[in-house]
Amino acid sequence: MDDIPDRIEHTVLGPTTTPADVRTCLDEALQYGMRACIPPWAVPLATEYANVPLTAVIDFPHGQGQTDSVCQAAKLAWDAGADELDMVCNVGLLKAGEDDAVRDHITEVVASVPVPVKVIVEAPLLSDAELERVGQLVADADAAYLKTATGFSEGGATVHDVEILSKYLPVKASGGVGSWADAKAMFEAGAERIGASSGDTIVREWQAETAGETVTEPESDRDGADTTDGY
């Protein structure tokens, strides 16, 4: 595991996220060689501020937008400079058994932009059978990744969920991944990426383990950003 920083999407997605928070996230991503995951409004700021691979979230965090509006949001984020997009699955439609609607919605969003689209399935809200269904639906929609969670529902990424979802597509484990021990468990379960607001902590702990050292974690510099659950 020598490419860990490039597999971390350092995240700032809290409801009180400020431009200063976004710049801090980008500074940390640059310092540690990570990617960044930010709100769509912040993409123009980010592209002017730093050369960091950017993911923008779309229809976040509930995934209940109309298809046309979500496609438009995706196009705007891509046009502003986002390298990848994380959209949210409509969990209500999934639970109602509206599988065709779920798949068709994702298919249209994926087709609307020429960049990879990850689909957040909000795994903490789903049964194993629903995870299997949504994994297949997202794969059929030609998305690039399955992502476990937004971080806004109770619970987050689990090894069990990653093991199920990784049968269908590469997985971005997100939600509650706050340490290198957490991230390592997700990678070992089959995750390809990690999304975490504590990405800097994860990389420092990985570096320390690799060097046989320990580190003392400083307090976050990010005013108002929620760094407790990893998003």
From Swiss-Prot:
Reported EC number(s) for this entry are 4.1.2.4
Protein name according to UniProt: Deoxyribose-phosphate aldolase
Q: Which SUPFAM superfamilies match?
A: Aldolase (SSF51569)
The catalysed reaction is: 2-deoxy-D-ribose 5-phosphate = D-glyceraldehyde 3-phosphate + acetaldehyde
Name of the gene encoding the protein in the UniProt record: deoC
Cellular compartment(s) = Cytoplasm
Q: In which pathway does it act?
A: Carbohydrate degradation; 2-deoxy-D-ribose 1-phosphate degradation; D-glyceraldehyde 3-phosphate and acetaldehyde from 2-deoxy-alpha-D-ribose 1-phosphate: step 2/2
This protein's species is: Haloarcula marismortui (strain ATCC 43049 / DSM 3752 / JCM 8966 / VKM B-1809) (Halobacterium marismortui)
GO CC, alphabetical: cytoplasm
What does the similarity note say? Answer: Belongs to the DeoC/FbaB aldolase family. DeoC type 1 subfamily.
Q: List, from the UniProt record, the residues annotated as the active site of this protein.
A: D86, K147, K172
User: Where is the region Disordered?
Assistant: 206-231
Q: Which GO MF terms are attached to this record?
A: deoxyribose-phosphate aldolase activity
Any one of the GO BP annotations: deoxyribonucleotide catabolic process
Q: Which UniProt keywords apply?
A: Cytoplasm, Lyase, Schiff base
Q: What does this protein do?
A: Catalyzes a reversible aldol reaction between acetaldehyde and D-glyceraldehyde 3-phosphate to generate 2-deoxy-D-ribose 5-phosphate.
Q: What is its main location?
A: cytoplasm
The top EC class, named as a word, is lyase
